[in-house]
Amino acid sequence: MGKIIGIDLGTTNSCVAIMEGNQVKVIENSEGTRTTPSIIAYMDDNEVLVGAPAKRQSVTNPRNTLFAVKRLIGRRFEEKEVQKDIGLMPYAIIKADNGDAWVEAHGEKLAPPQVSAEVLRKMKKTAEDYLGEPVTEAVITVPAYFNDSQRQATKDAGRIAGLEVKRIINEPTAAALAFGLDKAEKGDRKIAVYDLGGGTFDVSIIEIADVDGEMQFEVLSTNGDTFLGGEDFDQRIIDYIIGEFKKEQGVDLSKDVLALQRLKEAAEKAKIELSSSQQTEINLPYITADASGPKHLNLKITRAKLEALVEDLVERTIEPCRIAIKDAGVKVSDIDDVILVGGQTRMPKVQEKVKEFFGKDPRRDVNPDEAVAVGAAIQGQVLSGDRKDVLLLDVTPLSLGIETLGGVMTKMISKNTTIPTKHAQVYSTADDNQSAVTIKVFQGEREMAAGNKLLGEFNLEGIPPSPRGVPQIEVTFDIDANGILHVGAKDKATGKENKITIKANSGLTDAEIDQMIKDAEANAAEDHKLRELADSRNQGDALVHSTKKALTEYGDKLDAGEKEKIEAALKSLEDALKDTSADKAAIDAKVEELGQVSQKLGEKMYADMQAQQAGAAGAAGAAEGAAHAGGAQQAADDVVDAEFKEVKKD
């Protein structure tokens, strides 16, 4: 069996590594470098260039040289981030027939996984040249905040490149593996991995523990921004240069694709130089021409100017750090080490901001360009069975649940739950003699289901006719190690079952993930009010149902006046529940009123029960009715009412 290689498929650069025994080897490519630019050029003669050769010719072939394609992988064309990139990229971003964002080169439509596969193919060939044998299996890393769609697209890219992707793992987790196995420190440690790459930002809080000689890596929480990275820093420099040139020369370079490609190259170079110098000069002769002749660009940029241009981008990385610390249930002072990953973390301003937030200097002994590939190689060795002393426990980034009565999102699996995981909960019907239920599966952090992402729905049919609340329907959520969700529903009485797999292409887009979390925070108060209103309506519905049932059985034992009072209060509550504009206070008042006037009915029921000395089951049923009639809240043996619709049959 061949070796499982580890690949860091980056937005800007990619890297491949393997394990030789317990020693890691980051492999040099055919150009002699340990990282490869994630750039692909499609030439006139159908040749495809990858890496440094593609980068070298990009200025003369801007429309057919593709870079930062990882920002498009698994995305829909209509997303605002994609729309933003359309105006910035020299190559064409187009809408595919299925609504995804694709690219175009020489008039040919290309899917992002297809383009990324060229980079993976180069990584595969690099490993094969070193090993002298075919390579067919790989562990590929993705940003921790990548959604299922993006993960599946990355797996597809691997398959196109001729690789069986044994596992997709998160970049910060891979970096933690590389760090943890390289250090001699003993004892449990909590580390923060701050990963600012070319196109994405992630932060993960990870606990490294020594458990009976086995190194255990447990992700406590993760957060991030999947559209923030070095490309955005470059763009700030490009925009600044364009603005300055327009002021001086009166020419707008943003419409000139050849000039844009030269500016992109110069901006990246200037940014790198300013990490070690206080000032740099951008000198681009013959950048453009007009009626008066050729124009030359010459501009000095200081480190202070660059820091001013990108200050808000650096600041944007801090809020995810704050949320990750909170979600992990730790304090900043509990963090033993801060690991920097991604080339953009070489910027002094970034390091300064990280130190300011975490209160300690980040580690300098981790290579930010290679750590992720090294971690992927270690995981490959674990999966091949050659390494037994490492256990990796990762998490799911967003909560999963189903819609229940009143449109409430009832969470089955909370965000940052260790995967693989499985959870089951018993629900029931909302109407008498309901023969079918519809299970709606959602993902997100909002309290009301409508504010979250609908992943899918399915029916469970053939439920025997029963009063509402009697059938017991067990819903099971199961997330496997690859992050794929399986959902099942089973009628416990009949054993009838239905299952679906929520496939990756049903997952969230990264923009939706970011928006959900922002929405959840911004709308927390409104969500809470809606949740409380739904709870009041549910309580009112239950009281109406039980009071009607009690009146049918015991109403003739009441005085006419008492019965009329109950019926009037009952109608008043029903009217309030039908009124869509009724607020929580109005419904609660009607519930209280019906509870008060129903006390006599409850007393009659109780007296009748005592007199008859009914059997235990019958007594329990009557007591349940009395509790409802008296306005008490009923807890139905942990069975949650779920909002289900009748499935009509032809």
From Swiss-Prot:
Alphabetized InterPro entries for the sequence? ATPase_NBD, Chaperone_DnaK, Heat_shock_70_CS, HSP70_C_sf, HSP70_peptide-bd_sf, Hsp_70_fam
Among Pfam families, the record links this protein to:
HSP70
Q: Which residues form a coiled coil?
A: none
Query: What is this protein's expression induced by?
Result: By stress conditions e.g. heat shock.
Q: What superkingdom does the record give?
A: Bacteria
Q: Which UniProt keywords apply?
A: ATP-binding, Chaperone, Nucleotide-binding, Phosphoprotein, Stress response
Chain intervals with Low complexity compositional bias = 612-636
- Tell me the PANTHER family matching this sequence: HEAT SHOCK PROTEIN 70KDA
- Species: Burkholderia ambifaria (strain ATCC BAA-244 / DSM 16087 / CCUG 44356 / LMG 19182 / AMMD)
Q: What does this protein do?
A: Acts as a chaperone.
Q: Mind giving the lineage of the organism this protein is from? A: Bacteria, Pseudomonadati, Pseudomonadota, Betaproteobacteria, Burkholderiales
* Disordered, as annotated region: 612-650
GO molecular function terms noted in the UniProt entry: ATP binding; ATP-dependent protein folding chaperone; unfolded protein binding
Q: Which residues carry this modification: Phosphothreonine?
A: 200
The similarity annotation says:
Belongs to the heat shock protein 70 family.
State what protein this is by name: Chaperone protein DnaK
